Regions:
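Hydrophobic residues within beta-strands of alpha/beta enzymes
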Residues: 123, 184, 212, 234-236
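Active-site cofactor/substrate anionic-group-binding motifs, chiefly glycine-
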Residues: 25
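Translation machinery proteins
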Residues: 1-21
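Short active-site oxyanion
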Residues: 21, 151, 210-212
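Gly/Ser/Thr/Ala-enriched C-terminal appendages of enzymes
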Residues: 203-205, 210, 218-370
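Short coil/turn segments at secondary-structure boundaries
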Residues: 1, 66-70, 84, 342-349
């Protein structure tokens, strides 16, 4: 299907400026189904023009941050690094995935533009190809260790435990030159079993301070399993499963009209109905600041209002905050969740109630529209 757009309509975009209002939940806020994350109040063409891009940004980063937060919970305090660049769906997705996962608690990223653009700490290790480019594995280890002071050596290209033995011999020789081997990385096989064997080899060789870093198709469930079995792993690289949000590749994130020409509107499609009017979400917590329930309403209530003004009459009214500030806020938000909602397994739904006034408006809208 082809759509012909008159030239005057295209020309009018040159002078188009956003003149409306935007309210949003602060980045890093824990949110639940049927809650508006962002609200745009503007002339229709201004509001429609930004629809697809807003959905694209909100949907993707909410998806990745949610998956990353689960990995952080499963790692239980051990560092988790974003290794997702090669598996994400495009370069921008990799950059935004690095940002969203850092916001949700990852320690850093291996995606260099994430540091350049957002100041995310950079981490990396050697590649299998680096080892294979040398005729001797030990030579590869020594070259990398001497040139990279913050080194972590990849030891599973050939034989993981044999490589750990080489690391022990190399470490003592390099120590005389003032070079320390900081860590080793295991990227394949039974990570827990390999980690136990490697830890024993390193400890017996006097390398108790050398850390073990694990990667390779890791997600929150594997992290939890490795923790449960007591695997001696000091940190993790997580790529594919977070960068693609493998087991939950989309959210039903939508952008719908709720008021036009001074009248409340709503969609009534089967399984896709929306609530009308300019709504607010209020959050209620107990004395320990753990979340109890949210209310979706048209009224002013005494809870904490989650939608805050960001743009008024086309101008920013909220000062920008740093990514690290949002990261700290996100951590506080996750800590305020009831313990049962921080578990990886199925848990009770968090209560989000709809106020009587909103239900009454919904009934009025249904009565007055056909």
């Amino acid at each position: 299907m082809k759509i012909a757009v008159p030239a005057f309509m295209i020309a009018s975009l040159a002078s188009l400026r956003f003149t409306g209002d935007v309210a949003a939940m602060p980045e890093g806020t824990v949110c639940f189904p049927n809650e508006p994350l962002l609200q745009v109040s503007a002339p229709l063409r201004e509001a429609q023009l930004v629809e697809s891009r807003l959905l694209n940004l909100l949907h993707f980063q909410t998806l990745i941050a949610s998956k990353a937060a689960r990995c952080v919970q499963a790692a239980a305090g051990k560092p988790v690094i974003d290794f997702g660049l090669r598996r994400t769906h495009g370069a921008e997705a990799a950059l935004l995935s690095a940002r969203a996962s850092y916001l949700a608690g990852f320690t850093g990223t291996a995606t260099v533009p994430g540091n350049v653009r957002f100041g995310i700490p950079l981490f990396g290790t050697m590649a299998h190809s680096f080892v294979q480019a040398h005729d001797d594995e030990l030579e590869a280890f020594e070259t990398f260790a001497r040139t990279q002071t913050d080194n972590t050596l990849l030891i599973d290209t050939y034989d993981t435990e044999a490589a750990a033995g080489k690391i022990v011999a190399l470490a003592h020789r390099l120590k005389a030159a003032g070079v320390e081997i900081r860590g080793v990385r295991i990227d394949s096989g039974n990570l827990g079993e390999h980690a136990r064997l490697v830890r024993a080899i390193l400890d017996a060789g006097g390398l108790g301070q050398t850390q073990i870093f694990a990667s390779g198709n890791v997600d929150e469930y594997r992290l939890a399993a490795l923790r449960a079995e007591g695997a001696p792993i000091d940190g993790y690289g997580v790529g594919t499963h977070v960068g693609t949000s493998a087991d939950a590749p989309y959210l039903d994130c939508v952008y719908k009209l709720h008021e036009y020409a001074g009248r409340a509107r709503r969609k009534r499609s089967e399984h896709k109905a929306t609530w009308p009017g300019r709504k607010q979400v209020y959050r209620y917590a107990d004395a320990s600041q753990h979340m109890l329930y949210d209310v979706l309403t048209l009224d002013i209530q005494d809870g904490t209002a989650l939608l805050e003004p960001v743009i008024t009459a086309g101008r920013h009214v909220q000062r920008p905050v740093s990514l690290d500030h949002s990261r700290d806020y996100c951590r506080q938000q996750i800590e305020s969740l009831p313990a049962v909602l921080r578990a990886l397994d199925d848990s009770p739904s968090y209560p989000v109630t709809v106020s009587p006034t909103l239900r009454a408006l919904t009934s009025d809208v249904d009565t007055s529209t056909s």
